[in-house]
Amino acid sequence: MKFLNMIHFILCINQEKIEKVFERLIHRLHLQADAFTYKTGHNIVKIPIKDIIYFESEDHQIIIHYYTQNEYHKDSFYGLLDHVQKQLKSFQFLRIHKTYLVHHLYVRKYAYDKVYLSTGIELPIAQSKRKEIRAEQFAINRKESV
């Protein structure tokens, strides 16, 4: 009887791990399929979420920084960073500062007061956001390591 309980326990643990792996896989596939859409002038532009590095707010404009076909691009549109953040809530973007919304996939290193992106760019973390960013970073890393 104990042997059957052990097998059941092992299967349950493995089932949890398998479910988490599938969740991560689905999330990544979801990332590849989804795009961020915005209007600039008379054009409507669609950028794959996976290509977006970060958003920057300047006056009433949002500057979107992204890579596509191994080239760095930036574009701008009118809007609020709060609205962009809500729109991308399920895609692991971190609001590190009132002017920056960073895609977690492009963060190479977190320091106390800044993030280092894989593109070589350094962005400041607002003092009021440091504790929250560390907690979010820990949660994301924990999800990815399971």
Question: Regions from the language model: what does each represent?
Answer:
Residues 138-146:
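Short, charged, intrinsically disordered terminal tails
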Residues 1-18:
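Output/docking surface of receiver
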Residues 134-136:
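Short, surface-exposed, low-complexity cationic segments
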Residues 17-118:
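Conserved binding/recognition cores within well-folded domains
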